[in-house]
């Protein structure tokens, strides 16, 4: 969950003047072709439209709690209407393609949006709530059932239409939503069916936020990208010159972690323009100390933040720095592009010399050096005294800090495994690579040179010492008992898991350490970070793929994918926090599978692994890709859950069950990774960061360019 900052006291924030200034589009370039596609997932019809200055995501939610929502990448804005709960389930039907429109508000200011026609079989629809504001406001209302009173809008009821409109809270151009009844009747805020039991609506949603500049065609992808149209559509909807959006509908703005992970996984198939847009967006938003911004509040969400903090109605973006993992993701991703990829290397000096933001100030090279300095300084304590107290912990008073950023995602842990055992050593190694390349020389002081010279040695200490603190060990008998008990509680078969366990004891890394340094024995998928970013000890590689890809609940593998967590070896109270209804529970996240798959390929490219380890890697690769191929229909979604019947796991869209704590985005940036991540990869030039010759998945034919490189 991308948790926001409910108040200025909840997390560290920084306002940055100048982020509102959009990167100017190339005015002479032709406009991208119209993008129009639909994803039906669970109870949601998701229709995505991008044409000219309009980009919009229409969500029609069926079931017993119907709603209509339109989210706009422009300003992370949206409009939505929630209808009263119904005893029976009803289903929307979209009639034809939505149309992109532009209108002027009452003061002559431009509004951009869509018009769509939809029908539903229902006796009536009683309007319960209407919101026109930031998507953050709509998202929080959907999750928490509350919205700021300041964003309310009064309805204007006519004979056959009801509409809401208002300016943004700072007086800027705002939002409009109109429901025109094309079939049925309207009585106040109650829409009634015609004699045939159907309701027809013409839905118009508009925003006054400035449009973004779409990345498309060769400005987005090169010829090595998979031909998967669903993934291409998703990426095209989320990619802009100003930034890459994390997902839709709920995360239609910048998220540092999502940007960096996606850029790394997609790097072989992204254009130079797209990779540099991603990196530039992160560098632009770094704090003065070099911290990576987790999320930005823009548009009306920024206005609301300022109203709460200082009483002003400023729209200057507000940046949130509460996460810790992003600080250690920037270096390995930047190094992969600027040092290891021949395309990026040829452009690196000019890229780093450019200003880090539209307001001027420091260069990108200076900003990157600030981040690397932060990484190195934070690593010194553990290198001197390698104990839990000197690991990288969550920030004081904040319960989240890595990608598992729901309140229970780390099981109450304070020291995440992924940050300490994978990302810190990877960041230190990357800092060493970038220093040795000479790219950073214009930006480093004499003191920096001394500090950066320690990077490789610090990386080795962290690589050797940190994982040991997370080690969990169960005897064979204890592991069997835990697996049987947990399988019974879930109503799933234990036999495949027990068979996969074989005769040995069970060892795996803990998800996190608690505040006292004790391991939390949740099995997890985060070893994928280490597989992708580092040259691991062969024994660690073997343990990662052997243990994690065992059948659940001995490991993480199911027929519907690799789960991101397995609490079988925890107390029942902890198991309850990691259910298949929990956002970071026993569910499948598409990008985590892609990360692990890419990591396996990277390890297979090594020449120093024993034959037995390579054999285990190859077997793990076959197992993982069988699940990836079997779930290709949902691979562009954020995550999914599962059901179990007749001895088999089945995909269950996350957010469809009443017990699900949230819903999945139908379009997620890092879930498009399969445009680049394939079953086998042969590096051409500079390792996994360079252009790649690829043999695609079975369902995707090999392109001519790929064939020429084989």
Question: Locations of the language-model features?
Answer:
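Aromatic-rich carbohydrate-recognition surfaces in CAZymes
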Residues: 252-384, 421, 541, 589-607, ...
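Glycine- and acidic
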Residues: 243-248, 257-265, 312-316, 406-412, ...
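Short, mixed-charge aromatic SLiMs
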Residues: 283-293, 355-362, 551-562, 618-633
């Amino acid at each position: 969950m991308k948790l926001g900052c409910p108040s200025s006291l909840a997390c560290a924030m920084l306002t940055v003047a100048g982020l509102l200034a959009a990167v100017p589009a190339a005015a002479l370039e032709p406009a991208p072709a119209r993008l129009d596609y639909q994803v039906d997932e669970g109870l949601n019809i998701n229709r995505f439209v991008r044409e000219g200055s309009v980009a919009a995501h229409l969500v029609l939610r069926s079931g017993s709690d119907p709603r209509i929502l339109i989210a706009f990448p422009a300003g992370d804005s949206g409009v939505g209407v929630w209808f009263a709960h119904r005893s029976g389930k009803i289903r929307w039907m979209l009639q034809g393609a939505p149309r992109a429109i532009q209108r002027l508000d009452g003061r002559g200011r431009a509004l951009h949006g869509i018009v769509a026609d939809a029908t539903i079989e229902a006796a009536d629809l009683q309007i319960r709530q209407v919101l026109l504001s930031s998507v953050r406001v709509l998202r929080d209302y959907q999750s928490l059932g509350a919205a700021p009173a300041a964003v309310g809008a009064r309805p204007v009821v006519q004979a056959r239409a009801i509409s809401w409109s208002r300016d943004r809270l700072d007086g800027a151009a705002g939002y409009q939503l109109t429901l025109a009844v094309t079939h049925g009747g309207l009585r106040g805020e109650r829409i009634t069916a015609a004699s045939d039991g159907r309701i027809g609506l013409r839905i118009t949603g508009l925003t006054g936020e400035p449009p973004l500049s779409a990345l498309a065609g060769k400005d987005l992808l090169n010829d090595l990208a998979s031909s998967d149209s669903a993934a291409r559509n998703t990426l095209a909807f989320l990619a802009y010159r100003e930034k890459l959006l994390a997902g839709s509908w709920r995360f239609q703005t910048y998220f540092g972690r999502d940007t960096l992970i996606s850029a790394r996984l997609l790097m072989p198939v992204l254009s130079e323009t797209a990779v540099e847009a991603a990196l530039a967006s992160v560098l632009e938003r770094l704090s003065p100390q070099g911290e990576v911004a987790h999320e930005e509040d823009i548009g009306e969400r920024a206005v609301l933040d300022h109203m709460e903090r200082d009483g002003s109605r400023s729209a200057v973006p507000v940046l949130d720095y509460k996460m810790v993992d992003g600080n250690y993701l920037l270096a390995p991703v930047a190094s992969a592009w600027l040092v290891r990829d021949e395309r990026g290397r040829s452009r690196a000096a000019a890229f780093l010399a450019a200003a880090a933001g539209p307001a001027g100030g420091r260069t990108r090279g200076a900003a990157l050096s600030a981040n690397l300095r932060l990484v190195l300084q934070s690593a010194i304590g553990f290198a001197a005294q390698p104990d839990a107290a000197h690991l990288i912990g969550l920030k004081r008073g904040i319960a989240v800090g890595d990608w598992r950023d729901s309140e229970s995602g780390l099981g109450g842990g304070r020291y995440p495994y992924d940050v300490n055992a994978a990302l810190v050593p990877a960041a230190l190694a990357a800092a060493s690579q970038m220093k040795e390349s000479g790219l950073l020389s214009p930006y480093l002081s004499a003191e920096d040179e001394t500090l950066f010279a320690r990077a490789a040695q610090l990386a080795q200490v962290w690589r050797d010492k940190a994982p040991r603190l997370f080690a969990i060990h169960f005897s064979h008998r204890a592991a069997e008992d835990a697996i049987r008990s947990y399988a019974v509680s879930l109503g799933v078969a234990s036999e495949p898991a027990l068979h996969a366990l074989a005769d040995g004891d069970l060892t795996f890394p803990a998800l996190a350490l608690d505040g006292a340094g004790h391991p939390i024995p949740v099995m997890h998928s985060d070893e994928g970070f280490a597989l992708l970013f580092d040259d691991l000890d062969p024994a660690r590689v073997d343990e990662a793929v052997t243990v994690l890809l065992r059948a659940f609940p001995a490991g993480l593998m199911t027929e519907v994918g690799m789960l991101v967590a397995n609490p079988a070896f925890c107390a029942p109270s902890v198991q309850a926090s990691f259910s298949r209804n929990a956002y970071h529970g026993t569910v499948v996240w598409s990008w985590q599978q892609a990360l692990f798959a890419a990591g396996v390929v990277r390890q297979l490219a090594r020449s120093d692994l024993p034959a037995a380890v390579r054999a285990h890697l190859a077997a793990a690769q076959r197992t993982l890709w069988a699940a990836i191929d079997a779930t290709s229909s949902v691979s562009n979604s954020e995550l999914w859950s599962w059901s179990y019947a007749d001895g088999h796991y089945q995909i269950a869209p996350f957010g469809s069950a009443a017990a699900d704590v949230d819903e999945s985005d139908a379009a997620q940036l890092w879930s498009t990774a399969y445009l680049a991540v394939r079953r086998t990869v042969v590096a051409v030039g500079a390792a996994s960061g360079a252009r790649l010759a690829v043999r695609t998945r079975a369902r995707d034919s090999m392109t001519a360019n790929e064939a020429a490189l084989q």
